[in-house]
Amino acid sequence: MKPSLICGCPKFDESVPVERLNGRKISNNYASFVTLTDGYIKDAMCGYRIYPVEPFYKICRFSYIDSHMGFDTEILIRMIWKNVPIIYMPVEVSYPVGGKSNFRMIRDNIRISFMFARMTIGMWLRYPILNKRRKSQKSEKDKNKTDE
């Protein structure tokens, strides 16, 4: 069995700030774009994860990885590029009234934007492989639909 990334999939209650939901949607869409995986990424920013040791070690050893708010998203993208399977687990999330966030609006958005710029370049360098994988997965899904 191939090692998998266990990734939290947040189930937000009504306390979640709208700007956080919108930011997550943008990140999820962009992460899906740079991995060519339409709808596969449930939540790119959730830090509730269990990483498979060998792929994680190789990624960290041979790649520059953002060390702040972009870390979780970048690792997820790189794991998908390496074709590491992802298992999503639901995680209940609520935001306490008056809770403190470690997110710094300007600084962290700039860092995340630069991370996505690097990931876009990485996607284009890997495009032939990612596109072939995407087409293969799409044809497999189509085949499964016709078998039903």
Task: Mark where each language-model region is.
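Acceptor/aglycone-binding surface of glycosyltransferases and processive sugar-polymer synthases
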Residues: 1-69, 96-103, 107-113
